[in-house]
Structures are given as C-alpha cells and as structure tokens.
Amino acid sequence: LAGMGRDGIKGFQVNKDCSRTTRMKVIQNGLLVDLVDSRCNDKGWMDGAGVFETIRTVNNAPWALSRHMRRAVSSAKQLGFSIASEEVLRSAVALLCEVEKAPMGMLRLSFGDDGNWAAVHLPYEANTQPAALMTFQKPISAVVQPVKSYPYSHRLDILNFAKNSGFDEAIIVNDLGKVCEGSVTNLLLKLDDKWITPPISDGVLPGIMRALVIEYCGVSVKSIDVADLQRVQSAFLLSSLRIAQPVASIDG
C-alpha cells in the first residue's frame, strides 16, 4: 500500500439542516409520525438497548433489505427478544421512503429490546476516496459473539479516535492477536495474491457486503495475524453504505 496516498474520507454527509429536522417524518412502531413525536433521534437511535440495521437506498429503494432483516432477526434472537415481521417492516419502509425521499439515502432501522422500533431515511453522499487506516491498540475479546447492537458509542468512539489521530478508520484486533474488522466496517485484504476476510469466530460482525463477496467473488475466510498487516497488497473497507471503499494505507 506504500505510495498510494493518504487522502481523507469525509464519510457520509448526512443532511443536518435544522429546518428539515423539525418537519422530518420517521416510522415509530409501524406508524408514520413527526420526529418530535417519536422515540428516536434524527439519526434513528433510540434510548435503551437493542439491535439495528443501516441500509443503503437508491432512488428510495432499500438495498438487500431481506438480508438485513434476516440479520436483525438473528441478532435480536441472540439478545433474547423478537422484532416485527418483514412484511410489516417492508410496508413501513416503503411509506417512509415515499415521504422522506432521497436519490441516495441511509435507512436506519432500530429495534429496542422493549418492543419499540423506529426507522429514519436520510440523504447521504458517498465519498469513495481511498481511506487511511490505523491499528487500534486496545484488543477486543475473541470469545464474545459480535451482534450488531446499540448503544453503538463504543464503536463510534474508536472511529472518532482514528479520525482525531489523522486516519479515516481503525482496524480492531482481538486478544489473540488476530485482525477483526474496522470500527464500523468489515475488512477485505489481499495477501499473497489472494483476497481474504477474517472469520466471524475471530470477533467479526457478519456484514452484508462481507457475505456477498464471500458468496459471489471467491473471497476466502481465514484468520489474519496482526503482523500480516505489513504485507497487505491491497485492501477495501466493506459496508452496506460504503459498498467497497479502497484503502490507501495501513499505519502509514
């Protein structure tokens, strides 16, 4: 990755216009309501704990919604609660995207362990410039099964730490010295001319894009030692919003 540059990524520029927020419509428990009358904030987060999905939309149509719903059901089950049916969710999402339109958007669905759920649809702009990565030095447990859950502040704190250090994303390592993922992304790395991604068992969230590149692009699943990061030939950050963002450098 040497010499590939270190252009920063601005991320997804969510519309933060206050006048828009005051009249913003969201879904709360299947009903279209004003944001001020809902249980979520303007980014779709609710108080308490639960699971969530962040989904890319194109022309107001959510991408890979069924896959996201299956993951949400699985995540909720691991935490001991259930969520609304896919039929109910699809109907509510269609209504929301018809009212809060965006050529490209971010759909966030939050499912609380108390039975409440919410959805917001926000416009965003994707920045595909190559990202500079750093290795986060505080390891995570390799024993705990990752679940896409909130509060999400611990992951966002890692991302903010990376940005405050002059990087765009942080690589998380487990307590066995294995590479896991980015703070808010999965990793796709090229080593010895082969594309690989770390296994779920190493402490990796089961990303939708990660699953797709494994299924359709011949990507291998293999544990990666942190020392191997020095030998990476090429890399991408994977997420449902970024799709596949190229990496400019690692600890450069």
Q: Where are the regions that the model predicts?
A:
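Short, Lys/Arg-enriched N-terminal segments with co-localized hydrophobic residues
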Residues: 8-23
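Hydrophobic alpha-helical interaction segments
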Residues: 102-107, 160
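Helix-start/capping segments and mature chain N-termini
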Residues: 20-99, 112-251
